[in-house]
Amino acid sequence: MVLADPEDNAFCVLEERSEYADTGPIAALPLASADPGRNGEFWAWLTGWDDVPGSTTRSLRHPSGRGPFLELCPEAEPKTVKNRLHLDVRLETGEDPDEVSAAIAAHGGRELHPGWGELPWRSYADPSGNEFCALPAR
């Protein structure tokens, strides 16, 4: 069943599925993808998350086996507008933001320059154009 929150963001209430048995109240974060295989490789590299074996959709999950899946879903049509929601990733202590930026580009992503002035994080898009932010290490 597809519902919407007060800001009209769609979300699904799914039937019980064995693959989501231990994910908690949020089973999965779907991400539209022009190429789920390519984006799966990108997000696995960026997050360090592992492939979910036996999943019907290219899915990744934290190596601890806890929390929701990141599901790379085939997009219905090419992306034309900014996503209503986006993911944030945090750099590890000692990672150089410029080196991470170069590596993101080498893996098919690109840095965005939204013109918001000086901020502590940097904005990017994955190979399918999904926006995300890279936050500084704590």
What are these regions (language model features)?
Residues 117-119:
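Short, small/polar residue-rich loop motifs at catalytic or cofactor-binding pockets
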Residues 4-55, 60-113, 123-138:
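Glyoxalase I/VOC metalloenzyme domain signal
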